Amino acid sequence: MKRTYQPSKIRRARKHGFRNRMSTKNGRRVLAARRRKGRKVLAA
């Protein structure tokens, strides 16, 4: 059986990357929350 997680750097960046987060209001909210929490990594 094929596993469900088949890693792809491009897919990861497009779905969860910084530019994708910045492109929507809710995405920016996610980044703001992660900054507030003090996350070292903000986006994939």
UniProtKB/Swiss-Prot annotation:
Chain coiled-coil ranges: none
Record-level Gene Ontology MF annotations: structural constituent of ribosome
Region listing for Disordered, in residue ranges: 1-44
Keyword terms of this UniProt record: Ribonucleoprotein, Ribosomal protein
One Gene Ontology CC term in the entry: ribosome
Signal sequence annotation: none
GO BP field: translation
Chain ranges passing through the membrane: none
Stored InterPro entries: Ribosomal_bL34, Ribosomal_bL34_CS
Cystine pairings recorded for this chain: none
Basic residues bias (residue ranges): 1-19, 26-44
HAMAP family: Ribosomal_bL34
Family: Belongs to the bacterial ribosomal protein bL34 family.
Official protein name in the record: Large ribosomal subunit protein bL34
